[in-house]
Amino acid sequence: MLTVSLLVCAMMALTQADHDGVLKGTATEAGEVSPVFRSRRALVCPAGWTLHGQRCFYSEATAMTWDLAEANCVNKGGHLASIHSLEEQLYIKDIVAGIVWIGGSACKVAGAWSWTDGTPVDYRTWCPTKPNDILSDCCMQMTAAVDKCWDDLPCPASHASICAKAAI
């Protein structure tokens, strides 16, 4: 009797899960159903982008101003990269060469840094004596230094850039 009760409960749970869209069944030739959990699908990035965590990154080698670099990233469906941890900093450091624009800006109010993607500035790795908070130096770059620390520069300078967007 206990076995029958357990089987009925299991069948009801699976039926409800399938009804709620949690399971996607694939029938085999023997008529068995092999459940595939949708929440377990792999995250992917478009061609040319690399996956790290839940975000995709695109290294743009063409040198351009900070404003054009941001517009280029937006055109690709993202923004200049925001960096939220040492792990992300190290990942980006490994996929870029030289100086690159990243998504930080303080052009509206000197010293009030924000990311172009709207996420909070919750991690910082400024170079020593930076930022200098001069309003003309209001765009953020990752330097070519070994540690790839951040520096504030005038936005009209031309550099490569790194874009980021959510993986799908």
Swiss-Prot record:
Alphabetically ordered keywords of this record: Antifreeze protein, Disulfide bond, Lectin, Secreted, Signal
Protein name, per record: Type-2 ice-structuring protein
Limits of the C-type lectin domain: 52-164
SUPFAM superfamilies in alphabetical order: C-type lectin-like (SSF56436)
Annotated InterPro entries: AntifreezeII, C-type_lectin-like, C-type_lectin-like/link_sf, C-type_lectin/snaclec_domain, C-type_lectin_CS, CTDL_fold
Organism: Brachyopsis segaliensis (Sea poacher)
Keyword Disulfide bond: yes
Leader sequence segment: 1-17
Function field: Has antifreeze activity to protect fish blood from freezing at subzero sea water temperatures. Binds to ice crystals and inhibits their growth. The thermal hysteresis (TH) activity, the ability to lower the blood freezing point, is approximately 0.45 degrees Celsius at 0.15 mM for this protein.
The keyword Heme is assigned to this record: no
This protein's GO CC annotations: extracellular region
GO molecular function: carbohydrate binding
Disulfide-linked positions: 45-56, 73-163, 107-138, 127-149, 139-155
Propiece residues: 18-34
Protein location: Secreted
PROSITE patterns recorded: C_TYPE_LECTIN_1, C_TYPE_LECTIN_2
Domain of life: Eukaryota
